[in-house]
Amino acid sequence: MTAFKSDFLNILQERGFIHQCSDFEGLDALAAKGEATAYVGYDCTARSLHIGNYLTMMMLHWLQQSGNKPITLMGGGTTMVGDPSGKDETRAMRTVAEIEANKESIRGVFAKVLRYGDGKSDAVMLDNAEWLTKLNWIEMLRDVGRHFSVNRMLTMDSVRLRLEREQEMSFIEFNYMVCQAYDFVELAKRTGCKLQMGGSDQWGNIIMGVDLGRRMGTHQLFALTTPLLTTASGAKMGKTAQGAVWLNADQFSPYDFWQYWRNTEDADVGKFLKLFTTLPMSEIGKLEALGGSEINEAKKVLATEATALLHGRDAANEAAETARRTFEEGALAESLPTVEIPRGELDAGFGVLNAFVKAGLVASNGEARRQIKGGGLRVNDEPVTDDKMALSAAHLTPEGVIKLSFGKKKHILIKPA
């Protein structure tokens, strides 16, 4: 393990955040002086960011904790173009109104892990629409475009893989890397930002910005990326039967967030404690050393600390208590996630397969049938044995809900609206 001069790189290294860096020595010297102003860009493609974005948010958190300045760059401009990285087909074009709505929905989450203000290491939030939407086409081609080699652009994974598969790539997508590179140079001029961070899939785009800065006479710029986030079994992290693990509470409840971490594979507990909590490394070391059934206690700590960081300590403790009552006492907890269905549908008989799909506990009717055969689905704690069963008002508990369960740990309440 390399010993760095800066707290920033030492923290990232011991916690497992580092995948690639364009110049460790130069960045280390900059960070040691508290001059490593850095940014991460977040496109506004959805109403919420997801768990993959949370990883880079934690990098910004540790940057700030080590005395350097973080910038969160909202992609109001780049979202109009669409990042082709990791995509097999062109992204759907979003209207300006949709992008603005997404941006407003997203922006509040950053203050959960960053301190904003006017101080030397206080975070700032900018939007690349401020400069990208004002660019003159001819000036852009002459002043910026001439520094890009199409030969090199064709070797980037986001482009090369599409071409190898004979999948269409639009001209607007092809220009995404130009926009991202220009962002880096513009931020360097405006704020003195010298570091861009991102996921490993962004390495090529970030390096384009480093090179553009050199060609346009900007100070030396740096690139730093995180590893691809996967579980010990090799699966891409961040998906559940309900879909993506969103960061906004109205799209993925604190209880679901807590449960997501509680269900971590044994081999991943230590890694995720380092990446998604701020617990001291000494405490994480003790939790990593737990074995057998004791590893479940470490999972509860992971779930509570990760949830507290994003949703607050009260929400984390409430989620932990709800889980304890539900799983240890078998109680029907009112704070379980709830899905509403029209009262008329329930009165007419709501198919049990449809109910489990609508609740997000299974992905399809076929999966629901397979789980019923295996005894994995329950209604009000009673096993479902007939896939033609219909839920009705007769299934409502005294609390006016129907409890659906998948296995021992996944529960949803159905409530007539």
From Swiss-Prot:
A motif ('KMSKS' region) lies at residues 236-240. GO terms for biological process: tRNA aminoacylation; tyrosyl-tRNA aminoacylation. A motif ('HIGH' region) lies at residues 44-53. The lineage of its organism: Bacteria, Pseudomonadati, Pseudomonadota, Alphaproteobacteria, Hyphomicrobiales. It holds the Pfam family tRNA-synt_1b. Gene3D superfamilies: HUPs, RNA-binding S4 domain, Tyrosyl-Transfer RNA Synthetase. Keywords: Aminoacyl-tRNA synthetase, ATP-binding, Cytoplasm, Ligase, Nucleotide-binding, Protein biosynthesis, RNA-binding. Its EC number is 6.1.1.1. It is an enzyme of class 6 (ligase). ATP binds at K239. Homodimer. It is found in: Cytoplasm. This is Tyrosine--tRNA ligase.
